[in-house]
């Protein structure tokens, strides 16, 4: 059970996990933007798989904060 109630915006109801997804997406964009200039993607075998795993890890950490 999440700490936040269902949020209604302009008649549309959003579950609390929706905002956790958006927050983790914003953090993912920031982390990815910091990782690209470092050249870490040169050592990554499959960049799309790396990005997916990074997003999943960030979402897990964010969702653990709100439980």
From Swiss-Prot:
Its main location: membrane. The chain crosses the membrane at residues 3-23, 43-63. It is found in: Cell membrane. It is a multi-pass membrane protein. Keywords: Cell membrane, Membrane, Transmembrane, Transmembrane helix. One of its GO terms (cellular component) is plasma membrane. InterPro entries: DUF1656. HAMAP family: AaeX (MF_01546). Belongs to the AaeX family. This is Protein AaeX. It comes from Citrobacter koseri (strain ATCC BAA-895 / CDC 4225-83 / SGSC4696).
């Amino acid at each position: 059970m999440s700490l936040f109630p269902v949020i209604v915006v302009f008649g549309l109801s959003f579950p609390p996990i929706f905002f956790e997804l958006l927050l983790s997406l914003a953090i993912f964009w920031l982390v990815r933007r910091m990782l690209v200039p470092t050249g870490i993607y040169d050592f990554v075998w499959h960049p799309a798989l790396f990005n997916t795993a990074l997003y999943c890890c960030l979402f897990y950490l964010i969702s653990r904060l709100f439980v």
